[in-house]
Design a protein with these regions (language model features):
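Hinge/lid segment of periplasmic solute-binding proteins
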Residues: 11-34, 101-158, 167, 299-311, ...
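Extracytoplasmic/periplasmic substrate-binding proteins
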Residues: 52-56, 60, 106, 212, ...
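Extracytoplasmic "Venus flytrap"/periplasmic binding protein-like
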Residues: 61-132, 168-173, 270, 274-278
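Mature extracytoplasmic/periplasmic domains
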Residues: 116, 287, 316-317, 321-406
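Helix-loop-helix "hinge/cap" segment bordering the ligand-binding cleft or interdomain interface
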Residues: 120-127, 138-211, 223-257, 327-333, ...
Length: 445
């Protein structure tokens, strides 16, 4: 269920990070003795090591920890699979110290004391996050207000578009001019019509139904899926109508997020060439080695560096990752060191920004990075993505989040996909299919 007092806590933390100077935070404390220590390996579960591989050296340099002690264990190929498989790993009795949780389902793990320990057990306290974006701290608490997870990133989203096609089809030569054409959903779809026509009815404005949903859901939805223990589907009607209309017109690609046909649309060669004009991507997708780099074909690919970034039709976010401590850890000291370094140590977080190009969960670091203007992202032809996303990060509001979001979002996207592909015949049928799926998948609401 939605975190109690979450909305009030989130509201109190809203402030502009522009010109923000970090306040001093306490040093990492000692473990409280409730968890085991002295183990040989610090085992970390995640669905990939895209972020982790940049953390090893940073943690080792900051703490003196031998980085060979850190053991990454892959669980699943994406966040959804990890959500389903973590519990099985826990039951197996395998070594686990830390694990990464996605925003869609971190509450389910943090609300289970058998799966997550208070961060205080490893020497971490809430006042260490005085410089963090407030929503990340609120999302790291369980239903009783106990801090169970910490995040190193703030995951604001934007619209990554083909700058070469924008100039060819729209005469647009800057992100500012592009934003003027996509600054609302009405403007976005109006521009989509022009792109589709100028491309000979081959190029969709949006990369997928899932991409549009992520931006709409986390930018325009104002109610939690679950209120007073009951499902509230009132937010979906407008989206279903918008999705169907623009899918039928060819303005939304038929590709599915994370499937093999999704990212190749971003290239100018191959079977999927030029199938989409742009992607709805958050910070982590446009960092080094992320989804955008794959969509460009990698360094030397057909569209490498040919993208640009604007805010798009709404301020939105997608995901974010929280680090949690497994209660059966045997490395309480190292677990605390790892989390503190990557989520509270400003110097270490600055190194991560420089190495990974991700947007970290520290207002002072991101304010200084943005004001310096030295960040240059080769995926965007040298554009500084932080200049676009900086203000959006302040607007992230997760007060409507619930622990059921992963299943509900998946069921909705499946229902809308079926409706757009003709499996279901009407909007009412689509909504009913969604509600039936929820009834089967989420039995306690």
């Amino acid at each position: 269920l939605p975190i109690s007092s979450f909305a009030a806590e989130e509201e109190s933390s809203v402030e502009s990070a522009a010109g923000y100077t970090n306040v001093d935070v306490p040093a990492l404390g000692e473990p409280d003795g409730s968890l085991k220590d002295g183990g040989k390996q610090l085992t970390i579960l995640c669905w990939n090591d895209d972020d982790l591989k940049y953390m090893y050296d940073i943690v080792a340099d900051a703490t003196g920890m031998d980085k060979s002690m850190i053991n990454y264990k892959n669980v699943g190929s994406n966040g959804t699979e990890a959500n389903e498989q973590y519990a099985q790993v826990f039951l197996s009795g395998d070594d686990v110290d830390l694990y990464f949780c996605d925003a869609d389902w971190n509450m389910a793990y943090q609300n289970n004391d058998e799966y997550s320990a208070p961060l205080s057990a490893v020497g971490i306290s809430e006042d260490m996050y005085a410089n963090a974006y407030g929503y990340t701290v609120a999302m790291g608490k369980d239903k009783n207000g106990v801090l169970k997870g910490a995040s190193w990133q703030a995951a604001a989203g934007g619209y990554a578009y083909r700058a070469d096609l924008a100039e060819e089809y729209l005469g647009v030569t800057s992100p500012e001019d592009m934003q003027a054409q996509v600054g609302s959903w009405d403007d976005f779809w109006k521009t989509a019509a022009t792109v589709y026509e100028k491309s000979g009815n081959t190029t969709a404005m949006a990369d997928s139904l899932g991409g549009v949903w992520r931006a709409y859901s986390n930018g325009n939805r104002t109610k939690s899926w679950v209120n007073d223990g009951k499902l509230d589907p009132s937010s979906v009607g407008d989206f279903i109508s918008m999705a169907k209309e623009n899918f039928d017109k060819g303005y939304i690609s038929g590709a599915t997020q994370w499937n093999d046909d999704w990212l190749p649309q971003g290239m100018s060669d191959g079977a999927q060439a030029n199938k989409t004009f742009g992607f709805f991507f958050p910070t982590w997708a446009i960092a080094k080695g992320g989804s955008l780099e794959q969509a460009e074909g990698g360094e030397g690919g057909s569209t490498y560096g040919k993208y640009a970034l604007c805010e798009g039709p709404t301020s939105w976010f997608w995901g974010g990752t929280w680090i949690c401590v497994y209660p059966k850890t045997d490395n309480a000291k190292e677990a605390g060191q790892f989390i503190y370094t990557m989520t509270a140590d400003a110097d270490a977080m600055q190194k991560y920004v420089d190495a990974r190009g991700d947007f970290v969960n520290n207002k002072g670091v991101m304010s200084a990075t943005t004001e310096a203007g030295t960040n240059s992202n080769p995926l965007f032809g040298g554009q500084d993505q932080f200049q676009i996303l900086f203000n959006s990060a302040d607007k992230i509001d997760m007060s409507i989040a619930s622990e059921y979001d992963a299943k509900i979002n998946t069921d909705l996207q499946n229902a809308v996909q079926d409706y757009c592909n003709g499996v279901t015949a009407s909007e009412d049928d689509c909504l009913n299919a969604f509600l039936d799926a929820i009834a089967a998948d989420v039995t306690d609401i």
